[in-house]
């Protein structure tokens, strides 16, 4: 193993009008409990607040984010229907975080995880020795309907000065056009095809056992999946269900994630999260 087990999260790029949510606390607490981290870093522009924040803050190194990173240009949202939809739904913070995570890991190395990650098992030390590690996600259909490989950026491990991350960051800055993932997941897959030796790819099960679709969200929040062998963490795809008004994937929403639901619930997320509340 090269380097320390440092974990990085990005949050609070927009003003925080609501208290820090239990889902986000679970991401940090499950990391603390399962990963034996040398440090957990939270990178934020606006510091979170609330009871769950007060409970986890002593275990974190908090870093303030300044100006938007190079390459993140909100003016590009106007160039496409998809980009305008991203801006309209307020998902621009996710794009800024796409650039920040690459800069953070390029400079310091370690592991990055989205703050809607629920850790299940310790990430092996060997993963930290690779130049860069990503997990595959379900393939994405191109304009011609042909499925193309995609590598999700919700969990990334990398060494400081990673060659792959440097190439990815350059590509992201060139290709960002306001659409959801051309600069991120799709760009990573393109670069992997060009230079497969620079990247260690894990099967989707490691980080993305349940996909960003109706069946995947049902398996996470309505059903019980005990077949978690080989699963290191669960990505919860929070943007697809967080708002109670969004029901195209599920009627589950953030307001339903409470200590009581975790204590008594039978769904996969409740069962995995339950020990962390103890």
What spans do the regions from the language model cover?
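Glycosyltransferase-associated regions of secretory-pathway enzymes
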Residues: 1-97, 115-278
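Small-residue hinge/turn detector
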Residues: 98-110
């Amino acid at each position: 193993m090269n380097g320390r087990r440092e974990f990085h999260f990005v949050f609070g790029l927009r003003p925080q009008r609501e208290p820090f949510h239990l889902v986000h606390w679970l991401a940090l607490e499950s990391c603390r409990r399962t990963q034996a981290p040398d440090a957990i870093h939270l990178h934020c522009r606006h510091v979170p607040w609330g009871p769950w924040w007060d409970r986890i803050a002593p275990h974190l190194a908090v870093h303030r984010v300044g100006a938007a990173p190079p390459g993140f240009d909100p003016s590009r949202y106007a160039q496409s229907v998809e980009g305008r939809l991203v801006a309209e739904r307020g998902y621009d913070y996710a794009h800024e975080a796409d650039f920040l995570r690459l800069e953070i890991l390029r400079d310091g190395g370690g592991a990055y995880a989205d703050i809607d990650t629920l850790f299940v098992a310790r990430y092996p030390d060997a993963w930290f020795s690779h130049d860069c590690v990503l997990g595959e996600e379900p393939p994405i259909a191109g304009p011609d309907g042909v499925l193309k490989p995609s590598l999700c950026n919700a969990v990334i491990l990398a060494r400081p000065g990673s060659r792959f991350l440097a190439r990815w960051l350059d590509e992201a800055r060139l290709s960002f056009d306001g659409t959801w993932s051309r600069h991120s997941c799709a760009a990573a897959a393109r670069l992997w095809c060009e230079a497969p030796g620079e990247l260690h790819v894990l099967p989707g099960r490691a980080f993305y056992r349940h996909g960003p679709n109706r069946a995947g969200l049902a398996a996470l929040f309505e059903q019980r999946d005990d077949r978690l062998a080989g699963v290191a963490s669960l990505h919860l795809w929070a943007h697809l269900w967080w708002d109670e008004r969004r029901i195209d994937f599920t009627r589950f929403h953030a307001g339903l994630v409470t200590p009581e639901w975790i204590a008594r619930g039978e769904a996969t997320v409740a069962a995995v999260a339950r020990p962390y509340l103890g």
